[in-house]
C-alpha cells in the first residue's frame, strides 16, 4: 500500500478527491445511457439487462483502477468473497425498510392500495435500472467521497459531509425542496455511510440503495426522489406532507427520517466488521 489518507500532502489529497468526484460524476452520467436510450426507443428486456450489467461492471472496474491511482494496489471494499453475502443482505435491508415505511405511512392514513398491475418487462427493467443507480451513486458518494474524507478527517466528518452532499445533490430533482434534501441527508446519506463503514465493503450499501429505490417506486408506487415510475401497486397516497412526503415521494416523509435514523444508530451500535478502523 502506498501513501493514503492523512499521509498524503493535503494538496494531493484534495486534488484526488475533487478529480475522483468529477470523474465519477461523469462516469455515473454515462452509466445511465441504457436508461436514456430505452426511454426514447424501448429495448428488449434481455438486451437491457445485459447493457445494465455491462454498465454497472464498467463503473466497478473503473473504481478498481481509481483505487490504484489514489494509492492502493487493490480495492478492498470490492472484495469478491463478500459480494454475495453483503449485496443480498443489503437488498433485504432495503426491501424490509420500505415495507416497514409503507406500513407506517398506511397506519397514519397516508397510503392504501388502489389497484395492482403486473408488467413483467417493466419490473425487470426497473430492477436493473436501479442496479445501475445503486452501483454508480455508491461508488461516487461512499467509495470516493466518504472513504477519502474518513481517511483524512475521521468517520464523523466523513459521515456528515458526504451525507450533506448526497442529500443536497437531489435538490435539482423534480418536486425537490430544502426539506426533501435534508430528509435524504439524514435517512439515506447517514444510513448508507454507516452501512459502508460497518461492513467495510461497497456491496452492502449498493444492495440497500438498489432495493430501496426498486421497492419504493416500481413495487409500492411512490415517486423515487421526485421521479415517477411504472409500478406494481397503483396506490392512493393522501394526507399531510409530513406523513406522505408529497410529490417528492416517501423519502420526504417524517416516518422515513425516523426509520432511517434508527437503522443508522443500529449500525453504529452493532459490533463492526471493521472494528480496527476509526469510527
Which residues fall in each region the model found?
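Membrane-interface helix/loop boundary segments of multi-pass membrane proteins
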Residues: 136-161, 194-201
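Functionally important transmembrane alpha-helices
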Residues: 29, 181-241
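Juxtamembrane helix-loop-helix connectors linking adjacent transmembrane helices
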Residues: 30-49, 70-139, 146-151
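Hydrophobic alpha-helical transmembrane segments
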Residues: 14-18, 49-50, 87-92, 123-124, ...
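Aromatic-anchored segments of alpha-helical transmembrane domains
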Residues: 21-27, 98-104, 163-172, 211-219
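N-terminal, membrane-interfacial amphipathic/helix-forming hydrophobic leader that caps
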Residues: 1-74, 217-279
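Membrane-embedded alpha-helical segments of multi-pass membrane proteins
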Residues: 53-58, 123-128, 136, 183-187, ...
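Small-polar-interrupted transmembrane alpha-helices in polytopic inner-membrane proteins
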Residues: 95, 99-101, 130, 134, ...
Amino acid at each position: 500500500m502506498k501513501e493514503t489518507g492523512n499521509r498524503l500532502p493535503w494538496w494531493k489529497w484534495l486534488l484526488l478527491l475533487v478529480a475522483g468526484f468529477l470523474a465519477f460524476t461523469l462516469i455515473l452520467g454515462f452509466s445511465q445511457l441504457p436508461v436514456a436510450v430505452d426511454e426514447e426507443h424501448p429495448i428488449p428486456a434481455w438486451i437491457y439487462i445485459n447493457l445494465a450489467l455491462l454498465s454497472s461492471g464498467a463503473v466497478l472496474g473503473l473504481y478498481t483502477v481509481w483505487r490504484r491511482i489514489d494509492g492502493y494496489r487493490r480495492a478492498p471494499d470490492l472484495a469478491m468473497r463478500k459480494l454475495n453475502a453483503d449485496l443480498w443482505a443489503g437488498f433485504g435491508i432495503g426491501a424490509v425498510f420500505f415495507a416497514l415505511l409503507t406500513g407506517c405511512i398506511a397506519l397514519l392514513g397516508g397510503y392504501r392500495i388502489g389497484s395492482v398491475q403486473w408488467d413483467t418487462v417493466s419490473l425487470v427493467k426497473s430492477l436493473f435500472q436501479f442496479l445501475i443507480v445503486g452501483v454508480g451513486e455508491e461508488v461516487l458518494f461512499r467509495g470516493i467521497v466518504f472513504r477519502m474524507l474518513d481517511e483524512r478527517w475521521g468517520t464523523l466528518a466523513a459521515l456528515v459531509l458526504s451525507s450533506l452532499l448526497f442529500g443536497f445533490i437531489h435538490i435539482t430533482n423534480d418536486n425537490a425542496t430544502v426539506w426533501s434534501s435534508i430528509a435524504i441527508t439524514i435517512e439515506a446519506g447517514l444510513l448508507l455511510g454507516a452501512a459502508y463503514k460497518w461492513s467495510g465493503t461497497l456491496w452492502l450499501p449498493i444492495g440497500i440503495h438498489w432495493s430501496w429505490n426498486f421497492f419504493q417506486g416500481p413495487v409500492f408506487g411512490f415517486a423515487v426522489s421526485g421521479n415517477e415510475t411504472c409500478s406494481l401497486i397503483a396506490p392512493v397516497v393522501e394526507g399531510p406532507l409530513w406523513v406522505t412526503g408529497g410529490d417528492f415521494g416517501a423519502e420526504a416523509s417524517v416516518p422515513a427520517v425516523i426509520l432511517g435514523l434508527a437503522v443508522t444508530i443500529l449500525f453504529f451500535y452493532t459490533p463492526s466488521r471493521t472494528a480496527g478502523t476509526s469510527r
